[in-house]
A protein has these predicted regions:
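Alpha/beta hydrolase fold serine-hydrolase catalytic domain that processes acyl esters and thioesters
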Residues: 172-320
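A charge-rich, low-complexity, intrinsically flexible signal that marks solvent-exposed coils, linkers
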Residues: 339-348
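A glycine/proline-hinged amphipathic helix-loop "lid/cap" segment
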Residues: 1-84
Length: 349
């Protein structure tokens, strides 16, 4: 990383990833180089937030966003709600942002939430959960659960749990904790989540040094949010370590091929299906962790984001028993054996 522009060491990924994606990767590493981990947390967050602003394309037309607070036992939790003018929402998405449990907030993923709302017509509520290291587990989970419970108590709409990376972990943990709730989630959509999977898994080995997320990064983020004596088998910390995968809502997991966490999505799909549930896993070829921010400039990331939007729009319909209600993507996924998504093969070297 010694050059002025922090050019990423490309190694085996040099030809595996599209040139447009490399432009994105290098841009992220210019903003947020690995050595930034040596700075105080407040400075890391300031740089991360500035990077997120630089990638923000603005809100789609016809969208309104408003901030509020959800009263919880520990504190009032900031939230931001999104609605599309002239559209009666058919569901509400509770969104948990990424950032390794250390970074991010309502602004960092504002554009993604806005675009989910605009594309689906659903209400979206983004949760500003507490961050590590100031607040160790289960603080983030407690906030995530409190926001779900508030939505369940105040909205009659079907609830979709959604999150990316660390937020995908929280969404899944909430789904497990609330599966017997009278207003349990109608579906969950997890975007390259870290679920506490077996690090002997395929992607952990093959992509241990992938661009933008390495095995070392995963270990750092796990340790920084762990309270003393934290059990890795706690399902509110590592949903894949749960002993019971029954009763979970219809689930879509979308992962990136070149991401050590991808095997978590595959394993999670398999556990839910084995327990009699409905789950689909889709590994997006030639993409890396955090590809959502590349959706405007990298065609492959844009295609993957459309898959995500289709999954969010469709997941609440899976219990309706009407195939006409299911989007083409969901129909294609649901037609695969073992209730799984088509596991795409890379279409390039």
């Amino acid at each position: 990383m010694g050059t002025v522009h922090h050019m990423t060491r490309r190694g085996k990924y040099a030809r595996r990833l599209d040139p447009a994606l490399w432009v994105y990767i290098d841009r992220v590493n210019e903003w947020y180089p690995p050595e930034i981990a040596e700075l105080p947390i407040a400075e890391q967050r300031a740089v991360y937030d500035a990077m997120c602003r630089a990638f923000h394309p603005g809100h789609p037309p016809g969208l309104s966003a408003s901030d509020g607070l959800v009263a919880a036992a520990a504190r009032d939790i900031p939230v931001r709600g999104y609605r599309l003018a002239g559209k009666a929402p058919q569901a509400i998405v509770v969104y948990y942002h990424g950032g390794g449990f250390v970074l991010g907030g309502l602004d960092s993923h504002d554009d993604i939430c806005a675009e989910i709302c605009a594309a689906t017509g659903f209400e979206v509520l983004s949760a500003d959960y507490r961050l590590a290291p100031e607040h160790l587990h289960p603080a983030a989970f407690d906030d995530a659960l409190a926001v779900f419970e508030w939505v369940a108590a105040t909205s009659a709409l079907p609830i979709v749990l959604c999150g990316e990376s660390a937020g995908g972990n929280l969404a899944a943990a909430v789904a497990h904790a609330t599966r017997r709730h009278p207003r349990r989630a109608a579906g969950q959509v997890l975007i390259y989540p870290g679920l506490g999977g077996d690090e002997a898994g395929r992607s952990y080995i093959e992509h241990a040094e992938a661009p933008l997320l390495t095995l070392g990064d995963i270990d750092f983020y796990r340790r920084i949010r762990s309270a003393p004596g934290q059990s890795p088998d706690d399902p509110t910390f590592s949903p894949l370590r749960d002993s019971d995968f029954s009763g979970l809502p219809p689930t879509f997991v979308i992962t990136a091929e070149c991401d050590p966490l991808s095997s978590d999505g595959e394993a999670y799909r398999d556990r839910i299906v084995a327990a009699g549930g409905s789950a689909w896993w889709q590994e997006e070829p030639r993409l890396v962790h955090s590809f959502l921010r590349a959706r405007k400039n990298v065609p492959r990331a844009g295609e993957a984001f459309l898959d995500i939007l289709s999954a969010i729009a469709s997941v609440t319909m899976l219990g309706a028993g009407d195939g006409d209600l299911i989007s083409p993507l969901v129909g294609e996924m649901a037609g695969r054996p073992e209730g799984g998504a088509k596991d795409r093969e890379p279409s390039g070297s």
